[in-house]
Design a protein with these regions (language model features):
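Conserved alpha-helical scaffold segments that buttress catalytic/binding sites
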Residues: 1-172
Length: 172
């Protein structure tokens, strides 16, 4: 069983105490961030690489910490707006919890009835970590340029321990 903590920094932009929330999440994870990248859809490729390299098994749990659910359609190509749907279709035993404080919409508004039905039982959302959710075997962070101020981004990245001059993707 593998579990992934998937964080998009845009999640923190409307929080009154963003660094404290990031500290809570990383403290709960109990492990360093494994990879940082600019665009959130890069997570899916990285997760596949981690599976192929034997770093993790096919995920059964993804904690998706994001301002958006990233299930805005079921048609290719994979993008930042829909990659969670494609992850759920690829790994049929994978449950996703969308950790969100201010829910602006729902995946069922964007997916066809058939597409939503194929993932709905494995998708939950809320502002709290589900009870007994397994700690992650892999932690990934999307910077998502343009979604938050440079000042906040830099503060969050400093907490993560990431230096912007390094490549956007760490090697697993």
């Amino acid at each position: 069983m593998s579990s992934i903590l998937d964080i998009d920094l845009d999640y923190f932009r409307f929080l009154t105490r963003p660094l404290e929330r990031l500290n809570e999440l990383l403290g709960w994870a109990g492990r360093p961030v494994d990879a940082v990248f600019d665009h959130h859809q890069e997570a899916l490729e990285l997760w596949n690489d981690a599976i192929q390299k034997g770093v993790i098994r096919c995920p059964q749990f993804i904690l998706h910490v994001d301002e958006h659910h990233d299930m805005m359609g079921e048609r290719p190509p994979v993008s930042s707006g829909n990659f969670v749907y494609f992850a759920m279709r690829r790994w049929l035993a994978c449950s996703v919890h969308w950790l969100v404080d201010m829910r602006i919409d729902s995946p069922n508004q964007w997916l066809s009835a058939e597409a939503w039905e194929s993932v709905a039982e494995r998708f939950t959302s809320g502002s709290r970590l589900p009870r007994c959710w397994p700690k992650p075997d892999l932690v990934t962070v999307a910077i998502s340029p343009g979604f938050l101020s440079r000042k906040l981004r830099d503060r969050l990245m400093k907490r993560i321990g990431y230096i912007r001059s390094l490549p956007a993707r760490k090697v697993l």
